[in-house]
C-alpha cells in the first residue's frame, strides 16, 4: 500500500487527538450494539443484554481501549501494517475464529466514531485517508484466513 505524504499527515494529525480509551470503548460498544451477533465472541464479558448494559460494561471499555491502542500501532507503522498485525491475525483466525468481516464492520464504526468526535477536522480528505487505513488494517487482520 502506498501512502502519500498528505495521507500520512492527515492520519497522524487526527490520531494525535484521539482518546483511545474513550473512542475505543465507544467503537467496540457500537459494534456490539449495532451488530449483536458479534457479541458471541465476548461471552466472557458478562452482561451484554441491552445497549445500556454494553455501554456500562467495564470489560467492553477495557477491550475497546486495547483494540484502539493496537490500531495506533498501525498509525505508527503505516508502511508495515501487514507485519504489525501478523500475530493478531493468527490469534483471531486460529484461536478465536473471528469472522474476518467483523474487522471491516469495526473499521466502518471507527470511521463513524472519529467523524462524531472530530467533525471539524474530519474533512473528506481526512475521511478518505482514514477509510483507507481501516481497510488496510482489516485486510491485515484477515490475512491469516487466506
UniProtKB/Swiss-Prot annotation:
Please name the GO terms of the biological process aspect recorded for this protein, alphabetically: hydrogen peroxide catabolic process
Q: Which GO terms describe its cellular component?
A: blood microparticle; haptoglobin-hemoglobin complex; hemoglobin complex
Enumerate the residues binding heme b: 63, 92
Assembly and interaction partners: Heterotetramer of two alpha chains and two beta chains.
Family under the similarity heading = Belongs to the globin family.
**PANTHER family for this protein:** HEMOGLOBIN FAMILY MEMBER, HEMOGLOBIN SUBUNIT EPSILON
What the protein does? Involved in oxygen transport from the lung to the various peripheral tissues.
* Record protein name field: Hemoglobin subunit beta
* Originating species: Aptenodytes forsteri
Q: Which gene encodes it?
A: HBB
Amino acid at each position: 500500500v502506498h501512502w502519500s505524504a498528505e495521507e500520512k499527515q492527515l492520519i497522524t494529525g487526527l490520531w494525535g487527538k484521539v482518546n483511545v480509551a474513550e473512542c475505543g470503548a465507544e467503537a467496540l460498544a457500537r459494534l456490539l450494539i449495532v451488530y449483536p451477533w458479534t457479541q458471541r465472541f465476548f461471552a466472557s464479558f458478562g452482561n451484554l443484554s441491552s445497549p445500556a448494559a454494553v455501554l456500562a460494561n467495564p470489560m467492553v471499555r477495557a477491550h475497546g481501549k486495547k483494540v484502539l491502542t493496537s490500531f495506533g500501532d498501525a498509525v505508527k507503522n503505516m508502511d508495515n501494517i501487514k507485519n504489525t498485525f501478523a500475530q493478531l491475525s493468527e490469534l483471531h483466525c486460529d484461536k478465536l475464529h473471528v469472522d474476518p468481516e467483523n474487522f471491516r464492520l469495526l473499521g466502518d464504526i471507527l470511521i463513524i466514531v472519529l467523524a462524531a468526535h472530530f467533525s471539524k477536522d474530519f474533512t473528506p480528505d481526512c475521511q478518505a485517508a482514514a477509510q483507507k487505513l481501516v481497510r488496510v488494517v482489516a485486510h491485515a487482520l484477515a490475512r491469516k484466513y487466506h
